[in-house]
Amino acid sequence: MESEGSVSREGYLKENYHYFHLKDTAGQERDFHFHEFDKLVLLLSGRVDYVVENVSYELEPWTVLLIKHHTIHKALIDKTEPYERIIVYLDGKYFERAMPEARLMDCFARADRSGRHLLVPDKRQRRELEAGIQAFEQAMADPRFGARAMRDTLMMQLLILLGMMVPAAP
């Protein structure tokens, strides 16, 4: 990575996870960087490539990129069309404490070990992701009792779905 210039740490996570649903035409392009937390990127529309540890991935709608903490990456955004994506920053320690037997963050470690960070869901998996995201976004807008617990549970369900999509180690 030295040939790419300096690599910086970006973003801070002060909660268990942070969910972004973004749509714009500018797309904030950054130089190579890493985070202290795990990150998932789900492309909904637009054109973007991600370089992760010197491997370039062309994202298609409904593909998911798993980026483990300390992994160097950069987005290359085509700014000629709207870029809609979901980005989730995750505190792996929280999820490990919440459900240690579920190993919810293993999908990031398996993707990192295999060097295959891009998940391409089949039709059934895509429907499950769509339903999970819709339920999570509805829960985000819900002010009633238990809404926070519902959001946490739905985020865990999304991590379970992603874990099912990552191929098992040989």
Question: Where on the chain are the PLM-derived regions?
Answer:
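Polybasic "coupling" helices that flank or enter modular domains
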Residues: 153-158, 168-170
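A general structural signal marking secondary-structure boundaries and capping sites
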Residues: 69, 140-143, 162, 166-169
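All-alpha amphipathic helical-bundle segments outside canonical DNA-binding/catalytic cores
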Residues: 124, 140-156
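Short beta-strand His + acidic residue motifs that chelate non-heme Fe in jelly-roll/DSBH
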Residues: 49-51, 67, 73-80, 96
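Residues immediately flanking
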Residues: 45, 69, 90-92
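Generic protein-terminus/edge-of-domain signal
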Residues: 1-64, 71, 101-107, 113-117
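A hydrophobic/aromatic-rich effector-binding and dimerization subdomain
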Residues: 2-19, 76-138, 164-168
